[in-house]
Amino acid sequence: MRIIIVGCGKVGSALAEQLSAEGHELTLVDLSERRLEELTNRLDLTAVAGSGTSYQVLLEAGVQDTDLVIAVTTHDEINLLSCLTARKASGCHAIARVRDPQYVADLGFIRDELGISM
């Protein structure tokens, strides 16, 4: 499966390690070139420096050919916007890490109308 992970913090790094071990084709997107370099030195994956909310960055990451986008930054809004942009760009599946109870209350709308899993 071709997967784009937005965010290379603790969650994104752990997710990349697990999915890489399972044999998935990964592309990581993060603002930190240092974090991306650390992961590309350890894992077989592609890295793109930039914001996951940027349509151009997602295109560079190969969103048009990806199966799944998982956004796991520390910011709920960035995760939701990254997933929404990816869904509109390619129709791929999208999962956003969301911690704010406000968004959890809107889960049905976000899932059914925006097509984003949380």
Residue ranges and their predicted role:
Residues M1-M118:
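Cytosolic regulatory regions of ion transport systems
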